Amino acid sequence: MKKLALLLTVFLTAPLLALADNMGNDFRDHYVRGTSNLKAYNRDLNGLVGMVDFHTGRAKVFPGINLGANVSVFKPSSGNNISSDSYTVLPFLIAETKIPYLGVGVVARGTDVNGYRSLGGGLTYQMTLIEFLNLSFGAFYDNGRTDWYRNDHYSASAIASTTILMFTPYIGVGYDYGKIKTRGYDPNESASNGTPRGMVGLNVNPFPLLTGFVAYTVTKDSHGFTGGLGLNF
């Protein structure tokens, strides 16, 4: 299963990562204390990670598991004078299962690509409001780092979806809050802030074990795209 997840990640991310700069090196090359807008960089980083909150909108009941390979692509905001790429690219591996009887989903996610390492997770809850409308809620925490900074990311999200044949369109809202602190500088600098996030997406379930998904995300200052594949075991 791990090998399959790795193959999915490589397949989804290789073309994009080939065009992307190393996030750690890019920060080192463009960050200047007192001049660079660390708050704007932190806000964009929160949005980049927060887009992963709902990668498929569904989970299998334990011992079943949903394993996803996700790619986030986020455009740096106009105030971010640190990131040099037109878009920042970051893939994630995500594992999710649901606790029997409680209906609570448990999510683990992480990445170690493009100079950025992150490990996190959270809890989700799904309910049917009316016969054709499903609601999902989630709360997450992620701890990330490069060689030049560390960051903590907190998020909460809510999503509404409906299933028509093999298609599940959905719309969601969320809020990302994060703290960042540079490392290796004298003195180091820190920043913290948050921003709301809106999302619209589509899941496609062509086979019982396979789900594909794409979504568009907009924040107060920027926007991004996310997509990938999920496998149910």
What are these regions (language model features)?
Residues G115, D221-S222:
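Short acidic/glycine-enriched loop/turn segments that link adjacent beta-strands
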Residues L90-I94, G120-G122, S155-S157, R197-M199, ...:
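Membrane-embedded beta-strand positions in outer-membrane beta-barrel channels/transporters
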Residues D21-S86, R145-T211, T217-K220, L231-F233:
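Outer-membrane beta-barrel transmembrane domain signature
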Residues L4-A14:
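Sec-dependent N-terminal signal peptides
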